[in-house]
Amino acid sequence: MSNINVIDILKESDALLEGHFLLSSGRHSNRYCQCAKLLQCPQKAEKVISVIAEKLKEVDFNIIVGPAMGGVIVSYELARQTNKPGIFAERKEGVMCIRRGFEIKKGDKVIISEDVVTTGKSSLEVAKVIEEMGGEVVGIACIVDRRAEDIKTNYPIYSACKLEIETYEKDNCELCKKNIPFVKPGSREQK
């Protein structure tokens, strides 16, 4: 496999943005990663996800589950590259579930696929559903791991890249102090 610079591909795809952002957590940042911009470019997405597929070669799993929305395309492409089934979980009445005829069988070894892992919240919601159905989560695969050091998951993370993006409380945000307007790029509804 050739040496793939994931950060460069994210920048070329306008997926790694710089500016002033209000994150779904309510914190502010000067950088934001919007992997949907990468995923609209199939050839670039294929290259980046090949980095994850390479890391999964030694992992024993038989199915991939991506939470909607961000994990759906990642699940598909990772499934294509690893020759494993790829399905997705979605919310119904606010609760994550497996539907549309998809199933997790007792004993299935599952990789959860995501675009970006920040807090791990959606991955952990999906893991709960998988485990309730009798599956075993053996890892989380993602394009970007941007967890802070204090954010832990119970599962190994297989990422194409690790990004450390600083975040700030509104009161400590230098960009706010400079009156630079923010944008809300997140995928979760602001509360």
From Swiss-Prot:
Pfam families: Pribosyltran (PF00156). Its EC number is 2.4.2.10. GO terms for biological process: 'de novo' UMP biosynthetic process; pyrimidine nucleobase biosynthetic process; UMP biosynthetic process. The keyword Acetylation does not apply. It catalyses: orotidine 5'-phosphate + diphosphate = orotate + 5-phospho-alpha-D-ribose 1-diphosphate. Its cofactor is Mg(2+). Signal peptide: none annotated. Orotate binds at residues 118, 146. Keywords: Glycosyltransferase, Magnesium, Pyrimidine biosynthesis, Transferase. It comes from the Bacteria. The keyword Translocase does not apply. 5-phospho-alpha-D-ribose 1-diphosphate binds at residues 114-122. Disulfide bonds: none annotated. GO terms for molecular function: magnesium ion binding; orotate phosphoribosyltransferase activity. Catalyzes the transfer of a ribosyl phosphate group from 5-phosphoribose 1-diphosphate to orotate, leading to the formation of orotidine monophosphate (OMP). NCBIfam families: pyrE_Therm. Belongs to the purine/pyrimidine phosphoribosyltransferase family. PyrE subfamily. Homodimer. This is Orotate phosphoribosyltransferase. It comes from Clostridium botulinum (strain Hall / ATCC 3502 / NCTC 13319 / Type A).
